[in-house]
Amino acid sequence: MPLAQLAKAAGAAISRFNRVLEINALPSDEWDVVTEQGTVRAQHVVNAGGCFAPEVGAMVGVKVPLVNLEHQYLVTDSHPALASLARELPVVRDSRCAAYLRQEGQGLLIGPYENWGSKPWALKGMDWGFDRELFQGDLERLMPFLDRCMERMPIFSEVGVKTVINGPITHTPDDNVLVGPQAGLRNFWNLCGSSIGIAQGGIGKYLAQWMVHGQTELNMASLDSRRFGAWADRNYCITKGIESYEVMYTAMGANENRAQGRVRRTSPLFGMLADKGAVHGVVAGYEKPLWFRTNEITSEASTWERSAAHPAVALECAAVQNAAGVIDISGSA
């Protein structure tokens, strides 16, 4: 609301409970936004449709690469140990629990991101009648993770559950927000797919810079909505969206490439390089060779430090530096 008040003070008009029916492109590069209460002529349109972003995108003939999943959190009854604290507990994010745990008043708020058994929602499209309703809670689906939460924070096992909140949340294939120009359209922008909205509260500032100045003060490549092309079809988005949800709180190494949706795009050299022992990662959907197995080094573990493959990479660098080599960088084109 404070942002809305500031916008209105600066001259913006806000129309609520007014569904958009059509978005039509004009030869002037403007848009006619047809609503239930009339048509608005707009120089720019921003798709900030949240769960409805794919439906909004469909109005202008584009596919928005995100999927909705159910996410639950619960609030407990009060606990005397929390009531007696002089300061609030810090927020805990635990990979084994796959959950966040924090104090809520004199109780706890706990929200698992299930490592398995997550539940996608509205895969066949959103119902325009949906208006921020919540779903029935399903604690049985969370029990393996709640049991671990009780081990992590034993007072959780000593209180009852007061409230279970279950609602939809959007996830993109890589779990980064979709922001920036829509490929193939002029003056149409995306600002959607935010699965952790509180962490991206300032993203509107950078979209505004992009729209007004054509660039931003930050490198937005990892968030640019054009990073997904036609190759990221609906099945891919569903598979990767589910994976994004289920690895949300998994500790992943810097050298780790997610397993789902692989071998999506390949160069003509893919098969030959794989036969020669190439270990592939993913760049823009392309299988990109990272290093080659040797007789001594056949794999590397997930790590944030120098991996077991480092000596093999050193041999490859020396070969290219001292002789010659061909490097497949199709995914960087």
Regions found by a protein language model. Give the residues of each.
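C-terminal catalytic lobe of FAD-dependent flavoproteins
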Residues: 2, 96, 105, 119, ...
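Short Gly/Pro-enriched turn/cap motifs at secondary-structure boundaries
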Residues: 64-68, 89-93, 99-100, 160, ...
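Phosphate/diphosphate-binding loops
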Residues: 78, 86-104, 255-272
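Central beta-strand plus flanking loop segment that forms part of the substrate or channel wall
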Residues: 62-86, 144
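Helical element adjacent to the flavin cofactor pocket in flavoenzyme catalytic cores
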Residues: 1-44, 52, 201
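Short hydrophobic-aromatic micro-motifs
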Residues: 100-102, 108-112, 190, 288
